[in-house]
């Protein structure tokens, strides 16, 4: 630990830590948490730790739990606010749900789904007066009229809506104060925001921007809630502060309160997410916002060769001035960054060629030479960082490497629809529905997306060749038979997703699944992605036919709209966060994708990139200034240059041992930004290039501690290891039915009752109020799941809920906690569980779990499973809460006469159960998935009856 790290760790009050690449910022963050807990006696749940990505959150959680465990400190991670801003906002909104305007069962949507919602209603947006002043449908390029697809227009709408929301601008205020300014565009933008908000609320959707906006509204509107959180959260730490936006800064200021124990870590030189709304002003202006701020700089690089460190410093210093006309600096002055290593040589090289083809051939020869000389032992020690891995140049380089026998790993290169297994599956589905595929050329919507018809026809052609092989005759027979049934009955014989799982039971798809059982399979990952897409499609059907009851028209909509737009949006393949650089392959990454990673050898070939004006960011900045008076943190005319310099600084600083800049010598193939630095670098094949003695470390893997819960993981594995493999590891979508929705409805309404009681509002627990809670839950569940329950089932649900209230007879005094989450850090995993109800008096408590199914016999395997679940909960309660568990209770809502099954607490059984839990967790971590649920006396096990892979297993 160096002196700068020590000073930062012990700092009090607002603190800014400038931490460049490889300077040990994660280590510093973890050591600060350890210091606060061990030396300052701060409780873990009094610390908020915010990360920029989920991957960073997993890494911090794993390293933090290891450090705390070694120090003998137990942490309940559920109580600690650790994760991304979106995760923490969800946690706050869930805790104070009744104070928000959100439905309980809102559907969190991603970027594609948000954009799809807008696409469904694009005509309504286009009807806004002067809409085309903001959203163009075409532009002129060298005298040619270029059409902008409707999908790209929706992308722009979403960017404006998200960006303005994250600037905390209210559309009503925008219209009232500045509507006619900027040529009336502020009025158009305000109407777009209002239209989008209405659509989102009608569908019970919530996107990432709204999560933050709702959290801000909650904290601003309820001082008592803000006060409660400020007292609970004593220390706030934010990683990657240069990537935060305005609303995130405001959330931190609210939660920080008067104590201002806010510790931020970042590097302004790596601020590369302006297009996502990141504000460099947050980190540049931190010391002005918090005038008692302490500023520290980490100046020792533990990652890179000294020559690479010097090159990166020269890059940032050698560019145009970072100082504005008024003398303001738009970059922190870093001073010299020192490398911890004392290696010699010339680690920064250039590769050029008379054209791209020659340049690519030399890059391939260079990589091959590194391997032959033993400087690298695996091709995964090399990464190629591009402005876009989907560019023609990037794909050409991948093909050049392939000719040399060098594999590439490029999950974001846009190859998804070219993968053989994807072509087989989509092609077979298209052949199954000739009512669409025979006429798709004549559909207007299919003309919107360039290349989609070619993709569909190619998929069908590849599928036909596959089906013609004798080995695949069973699939061909199934296809012919099912297609005839659909044609004759004019409806699907099963849900769309069920049909896919029937297909997967036949070769060649079953061969892919067999391979996935033996080891990691990217082909199985791609098939899984399609099942998840189909499952999510059900949330967007225009009519609610009931879960799994799609019509032929719905399937046509899937192909003509949902899958088409998925293609146009750009589909990424699976990325393993732990094995981020698969053995045997050179990694191809976008520069933004590479942020936070490091590679022994980095090659940067996209030196033709020029600084580009970002029209959307510019308009958002103008609107913010007009409406709120807040000026941009940087000169608008310089933003595009600053962004380009920071982007390539981020790329260059990923390198540990060797950094290579590559470019064609053709005019225009090296932009002005790089022309000054390329001649100063030695060519890779020049005599002065002294790098052959440099050897590279092996690329490791990230190891994240997984979370294991009894019901969703351990019990599922014990029921059938292979089912665990498909649904938990490969994430194939499940075909859940209305029975799951019924259980959710009863559970959520009982939770509403418990929450009211715990708030001291037991007097509200009366039939009319309970019915209102139940119907509110039902409406939001129905909208979310695109399903419904018959009237008789709703009456039954209300009867069971009332039965529980009657059973209580108004006695709620023993209720201690509802939906109580607990976690325990083990050596190799994190054990977690959520207890429906914890009740009792004094130190003696009972653990209660609610079941909506039929009560099984006492000697059945299912009852034993239920008891095991309670024993795991008992272990968590006694270990984490220090409370003695007296009884374990199952409450069956369907049994009005005798709903409770009570088990005595047995420490011997709990210890045995936890030994079994550990053993099951060990098997999961060892990827022992080859076993199926056992058949007994030719009787189909219960686990198989509703299993999506039943036919694959031949059962």
What is each residue range found by the language model?
Residues 1-18, 48-49, 56-57, 81, ...:
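Conserved helicase NTPase motor core
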Residues 34-38, 246-352, 624:
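Conserved RecA-like helicase ATPase core segment
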Residues 289-290, 346, 372-518:
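ATPase/helicase motor core of nucleic-acid motors
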Residues 1-102, 108, 227, 649, ...:
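P-loop NTPase Walker
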Residues 17, 26, 44, 292-293, ...:
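Helicase P-loop NTPase motor core
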Residues 583, 627-682, 923-945:
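C-terminal accessory regions
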Residues 81-91, 237-240, 265, 565-616, ...:
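Conserved helicase core region in the C-terminal RecA-like lobe
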Residues 183-189, 195, 205, 375, ...:
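Accessory C-terminal helicase-associated subdomains
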């Amino acid at each position: 630990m160096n002196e700068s790290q020590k000073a930062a760790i012990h700092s009090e009050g607002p603190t800014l830590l400038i931490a460049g690449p490889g300077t040990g910022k994660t280590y510093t963050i973890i050591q600060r948490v350890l210091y606060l807990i061990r030396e300052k006696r701060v409780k873990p749940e009094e610390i908020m730790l915010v990360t920029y990505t989920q991957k960073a959150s997993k890494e911090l959680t794993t390293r933090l739990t290891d450090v705390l465990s070694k120090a003998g400190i137990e942490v309940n991670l559920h109580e600690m606010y650790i994760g991304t801003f979106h995760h923490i906002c969800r946690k706050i909104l869930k805790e104070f749900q009744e104070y928000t305007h959100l439905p309980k069962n809102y559907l969190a949507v991603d970027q594609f789904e948000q954009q799809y919602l807008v696409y469904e209603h694009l005509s309504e947006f286009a009807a806004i007066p002067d809409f085309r002043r903001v959203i163009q449908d075409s532009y002129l390029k060298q005298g040619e009229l270029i059409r902008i697809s409707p999908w790209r227009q929706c992308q722009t709408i979403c960017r404006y809506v998200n960006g303005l929301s994250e600037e905390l601008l209210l559309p009503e205020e925008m219209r009232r104060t500045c509507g006619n300014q900027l040529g009336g565009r502020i009025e158009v933008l305000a109407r777009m925001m209002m239209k989008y908000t209405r659509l989102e609320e009608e569908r019970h959707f919530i996107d990432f921007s709204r999560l933050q906006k709702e959290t801000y509204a909650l904290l601003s509107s309820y001082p008592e809630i803000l006060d409660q959180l400020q007292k609970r959260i004593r220390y706030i730490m934010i990683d990657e502060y240069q990537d935060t936006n305005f609303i995130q800064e405001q959330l931190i200021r609210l939660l920080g309160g008067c104590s201002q124990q806010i510790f931020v870590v970042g590097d302004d030189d790596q601020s590369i997410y302006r297009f996502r709304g990141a504000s460099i002003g947050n980190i540049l202006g931190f010391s002005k916002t918090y005038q008692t701020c302490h500023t520290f700089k980490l100046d020792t690089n533990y990652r890179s060769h000294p020559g690479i460190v010097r090159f990166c410093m020269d890059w940032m210093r050698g560019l145009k001035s970072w100082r504005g006309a008024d003398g303001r600096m738009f970059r922190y002055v870093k001073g010299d960054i020192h490398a911890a290593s004392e290696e010699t040589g010339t680690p920064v090289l250039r590769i050029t060629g008379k054209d791209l083809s020659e340049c690519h051939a030399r890059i391939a020869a260079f990589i091959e030479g590194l391997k032959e000389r033993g400087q690298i032992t695996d091709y995964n020690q090399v990464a190629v960082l591009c402005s876009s891995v989907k560019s023609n140049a990037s794909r050409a380089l991948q093909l050049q490497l392939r000719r040399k026998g060098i594999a590439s790993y490029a999950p974001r290169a846009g190859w998804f629809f070219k993968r053989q297994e994807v072509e087989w599956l989509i092609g077979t589905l298209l052949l199954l529905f000739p009512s669409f595929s025979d006429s798709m050329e004549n559909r207007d919507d299919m003309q919107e997306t360039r290349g989609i018809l070619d993709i569909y026809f190619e998929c069908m052609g590849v599928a036909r060749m596959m089906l013609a092989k004798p080995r695949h005759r069973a699939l061909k027979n199934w296809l012919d038979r099912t297609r005839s049934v659909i044609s004759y009955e004019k409806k699907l014989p099963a849900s769309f997703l069920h049909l896919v799982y029937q297909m997967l039971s036949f070769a060649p798809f079953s061969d892919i699944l067999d391979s996935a059982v033996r080891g990691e399979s990217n082909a199985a990952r791609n098939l899984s992605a399609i099942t998840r897409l189909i499952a999510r499609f059900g949330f967007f059907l225009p009519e609610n036919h009931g879960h799994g009851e799609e019509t032929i028209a719905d399937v046509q909509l899937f192909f003509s709209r949902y899958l088409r737009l998925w293609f146009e949006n750009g589909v990424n393949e699976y990325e393993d966060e732990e094995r981020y650089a698969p053995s045997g392959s050179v990694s191809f990454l976008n520069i933004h994708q590479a942020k936070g990673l490091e590679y022994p050898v980095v090659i940067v070939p996209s030196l033709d990139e020029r600084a580009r004006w970002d029209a959307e960011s510019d308009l958002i900045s103008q609107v913010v200034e007009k409406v709120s008076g807040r000026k941009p943190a940087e000169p608008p005319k310089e933003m595009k240059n600053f962004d380009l310099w920071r982007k390539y600084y981020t790329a260059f600083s990923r390198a540990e041992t060797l950094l290579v800049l590559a470019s064609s010598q053709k005019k225009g193939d090296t932009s002005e930004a790089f022309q000054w630095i390329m001649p100063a670098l030695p060519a890779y094949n020049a005599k002065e290039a002294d790098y052959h003695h440099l050897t590279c470390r092996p690329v490791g893997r990230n190891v994240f501690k997984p979370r294991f819960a009894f019901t969703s993981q351990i019990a599922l594995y014990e029921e059938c290891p292979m089912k665990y493999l498909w649904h938990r590891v490969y994430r194939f979508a499940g075909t859940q039915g209305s029975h799951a929705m019924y259980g959710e409805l009863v559970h959520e309404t009982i939770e509403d009752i418990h929450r009211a009681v715990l708030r001291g509002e037991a007097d509200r627990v009366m039939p009319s109020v309970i019915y209102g809670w139940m119907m509110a839950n039902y409406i939001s569940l129905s909208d979310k799941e695109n399903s419904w329950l018959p009237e008789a089932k709703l009456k039954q649900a209300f009867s069971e809920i009332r039965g529980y209230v009657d059973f209580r007879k108004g006695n709620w005094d023993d209720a201690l906690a509802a939906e109580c989450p607990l976690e325990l850090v083990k050596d190799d995993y994190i054990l977690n569980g959520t207890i429906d109800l914890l009740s009792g008096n004094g130190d003696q408590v009972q653990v209660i779990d609610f079941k909506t199914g039929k009560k099984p016999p006492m000697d059945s395997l299912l009852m034993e499973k239920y008891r095991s679940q309670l024993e795991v909960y008992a272990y968590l309660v006694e270990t984490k809460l220090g409370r003695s568990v007296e009884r374990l209770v199952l409450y069956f809502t369907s049994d009005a006469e005798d709903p409770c099954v009570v088990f005595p607490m047995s420490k011997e059984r709990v210890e045995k159960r936890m030994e079994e839990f550990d053993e099951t967790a060990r098997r999961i971590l060892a990827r022992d998935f080859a076993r199926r649920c056992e058949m007994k006396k030719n009787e189909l096990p219960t686990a198989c009856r509703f299993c999506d892979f039943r036919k694959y297993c031949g059962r």
